[in-house]
C-alpha cells in the first residue's frame, strides 16, 4: 500500500502519542531483529523505533534497510526515532489500516 500525503499525516498524528517499542543498538541491524519488528507490526500496524547513540548505523541506513528488506513503510523520521507502518496480515488486526484507506 503506497501512502499519500494525507494518509501519512494521519499516521504521524497517531504515532506522536506512542513510545518507541524497538531500539537499534551496537548489535546493529540483523535478520532476527527485522523478523521481530515485522511480527510486532502485524499486531500493531504502527510503531516507533529508537536508534540508540551507541549504534553504528545512521537513521538513513536503518530506513533503507527496513524499506529494502520488507514492505514496511517509514512514515516519519524525527532525530533518531522512526515511525513505521505496515498493513497487518491478520484481518482482525487491521483497525488502523482500515481508517487509512478511507482517507
Label every model-predicted segment.
Residues 1-103:
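Positively charged, polar, low-complexity stretches
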Amino acid at each position: 500500500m503506497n501512502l499519500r500525503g494525507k494518509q501519512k499525516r494521519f499516521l504521524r498524528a497517531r504515532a506522536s502519542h506512542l513510545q518507541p517499542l524497538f531500539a537499534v543498538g551496537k548489535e546493529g541491524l540483523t535478520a532476527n531483529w527485522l523478523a521481530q519488528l515485522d511480527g510486532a507490526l502485524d499486531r500493531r500496524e504502527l510503531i516507533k523505533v529508537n536508534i540508540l547513540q551507541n549504534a553504528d548505523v545512521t537513521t538513513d541506513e536503518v530506513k533503507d534497510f527496513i524499506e529494502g528488506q520488507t514492505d514496511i513503510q517509514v512514515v516519519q523520521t524525527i532525530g533518531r526515532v522512526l515511525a513505521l507502518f505496515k498493513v497487518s496480515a491478520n484481518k482482525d488486526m487491521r483497525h488502523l489500516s482500515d481508517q487509512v484507506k478511507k482517507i
